[in-house]
Regions:
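A generic structural motif
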Residues: 11, 91-95
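Active-site-adjacent segment of FAD-dependent monooxygenases/related oxidoreductases
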Residues: 1-66, 82, 143-146, 156-162, ...
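Conserved FAD-binding catalytic core of PHBH/FMO-like flavoproteins
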Residues: 62-63, 89, 107, 111-212
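Membrane-interface helix/loop caps of multi-pass membrane proteins
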Residues: 39-51, 90-92, 118-119, 180-182
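A conserved short coil-to-beta-strand element within the FAD-binding core of flavoproteins
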Residues: 74-89
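Core beta-strand elements of the Rossmann-like FAD/NAD(P) dinucleotide-binding domain
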Residues: 96-107, 111
């Protein structure tokens, strides 16, 4: 929504005590030049917009599909590749049980996420700490969640407590939320964590609270 705050809040949980807040104007507030925020002074005629990839990707996908020189293959996993003097041959599996694919190309680029199999196979590495590979992301539908907070909503909420730390991002400003659950050092993988329990600790809700 145009009037939804772009703020970043820090709380003991999404519904818990607020510790601090970075105030960032909503799209509607940016029309008032007297309203200030950390990004209101950027030298650009187009102010920042908080738009999740679930809205952007269909637009980009449709544009890519309209280009005759592109072929998009979904639900396909590259398993290995071989490089020679003239290019690269990659082998992939159809995740819906179809025939294996042999793909001949000039280049292979690892753009398949933080835990990218392709990136690892070609030896490309991150710089810094690969924390992104240890974040369990869950998109939830919780239309009643905003009823449980006593303060103004925020675009991003950092949940910090001894039980679980994570982030909650507003997707549509009403009912859709992206919950990031950060794995602890001793947790070897996502299977080591009860996802539902972790989400409830980050949100600060009990077992009776319903979300999908």
């Amino acid at each position: 929504p145009h009037d939804y705050p772009h703020d970043v809040a820090y709380r003991t949980s999404f519904t818990g005590t607020e510790l601090s807040r970075i105030r960032i104007p909503s799209r509607a507030e940016r029309r008032d030049k007297s309203v200030q925020g950390p990004d209101t002074g950027w030298p650009t005629p187009e102010p920042p917009h908080r738009i999740n990839q679930i809205y952007i990707e269909p637009i980009l996908f449709a544009h890519a599909e309209s280009m005759a020189q592109l072929r998009i293959i979904c639900r396909t996993q590259v398993t290995h590749y071989e490089q020679d003097d003239t290019g690269v041959t990659a082998w992939a599996n159809d995740l819906d049980g179809g025939e294996p694919l042999r793909i001949r190309c000039d280049y292979v680029v690892g753009c398949d996420g933080g835990r990218s199999m392709v990136r690892k196979a070609i030896g490309a590495t991150f710089t810094g700490v690969d924390t992104v590979a240890r974040v369990q992301s869950t998109l939830i539908d919780a239309p009643d969640l905003l009823k449980h907070i006593a303060v103004k909503p925020a675009w991003a909420t950092f949940s910090v407590n001894p039980r679980r730390s994570g982030n909650v991002y507003a997707i549509d400003g009403h009912r859709r939320w992206l919950v990031h659950n950060y794995l602890r050092t001793e947790e070897t993988g996502f299977d080591a964590v009860n996802r539902d329990w972790a989400i409830r600790q980050i949100l600060g809700v009990d077992a009776q609270f319903h979300y999908d």
